[in-house]
Structure formats: structure tokens, C-alpha cells
Amino acid sequence: MAITDWPEDERPREKLLSRGANALSDAELLALFLRVGIRGRTAVDLARDLIARFGTLTRLCSATSSEFAAIPGMGLAKYAQLQAVMELARRALSETLCARDLFDSPEAVRDWLRLRLGHLPHETFCVLLLDARNTLIDAVDLFRGTLTQTSVYPREVVKLALDRNAAAVIFAHNHPSGAAEPSSADEQLTRHLKDALALVDIRVLDHFVVPAHGKPTSFAERGLI
């Protein structure tokens, strides 16, 4: 049965317009993105297939073009559309962060970090550069790979902060394995970088660990800064 034959209050588009996007399931939201199904399968059916195939929305959104296009009914055009939607979400959250004190919007910071780092298959170290009012100047992915005191160079972090005239920084890195807990190496690295930046009067306000799924962990909230 086609979606147009469903009761009106069960159709994803009509449900969104009458009750808001929060009322829709993951599959219904994804079906609106897909717009149409294929022979014998509605857009909702295809959406459920995608979620079942990848397990989570995070894995779906971080799929490669070849993985995405391998699903019946999908293709490179849909993959490009999905990446565009994700980038729009990242940019919208970046505008929010740039317009206000980051400490007034901690959940926006977490949401943005999940979008920027949570889907990456490799460990990435990101530096958020803040001005004296704690508004975002820029965010830079500085290092990739296994992060240790020997792979993250303090001089590069200090140089970046000075070049951007930052008054403070927030660090973030992802754990592709899914673990949200800071490791002892993470704590040692943070102390090492904090000491280096203190020499040039730049504050380290926080360090977030971003898991593949779930809520990023704040060092500051744990008393580790």
C-alpha cells in the first residue's frame, strides 16, 4: 500500500505538519528525506531497511558512498543529499556557538561535537578557539590517529591559539570504539597541554570525549580540568 493510501494522520509529512518533527519516528523522518520508495516498498519501508542495515542513525550518516549506494533504492544522489543535510546541521549549530557564550549553551556544544566528530572512523583531536567573551572564533581539527603526548604537539596547539588570538580553548576528541570515558592518557595529555598554554596565558576550559554513540563526556564536569 502506498503512503498516500494511509490514513492522513499516519502519513509522515502530514504528521510532521500537524504535530511537529518530534512526533515522528527515526524511520518516518528518514522516509521524508527519501521522499519516494521503490516498486513494492514505500519510503518508510526503505527507511526501516536502512536503519536495520546500519544499526544506528550515526552509522547511517557516516556510511561511505559505496556502502550507502549498495542498498536497493539508494544511490549517489541520495548519498550527496544526506551529506548536505548533515553539513547544514553542523553549520547551523556553528552559528549558534559563534553567537553566544559557550557556557550558556553546553548542550549546543555537545550536539555540535557529536555532529563534527561522533561519526568519524578515526580518532581526531579538535581545538575550539574562544575569545575573551567565550564565544567561538574557530574550530580546527588538528591531529588524527591515536592521541598521545607524543602525537599531539603542544607547540602546534600553542601556535594555533596565538595565531587566532584566542583567550581560551576547549579540546575535544572522539573515541571511535564507542567508549565515553576519558583514558589515563587523555588526562595526561590534557594536563600537558594546559601547562603549555598557561605559559602564554591561554586558559583550557574543558576537554570533551565524544563517543560514537551517546553523550560527550566533559572533563570539567568530572573535575579533571
UniProtKB/Swiss-Prot annotation:
Single GO biological process annotation from the record: proteolysis
InterPro entries documented for this protein: MPN, RadC_JAB, RuvA_2-like, UPF0758, UPF0758_CS, UPF0758_N
Residue positions of motif JAMM motif: 173-186
A GO term, aspect molecular function: metallopeptidase activity
Record-listed Zn(2+) binding positions: 173, 175, 186
Domain of life, source organism: Bacteria
Entry keywords, A to Z: Hydrolase, Metal-binding, Metalloprotease, Protease, Zinc
Pfam families, alphabetized: RadC, UPF0758_N
Protein family per UniProt: Belongs to the UPF0758 family.
Protein known as: UPF0758 protein azo1137
Organism: Azoarcus sp. (strain BH72)
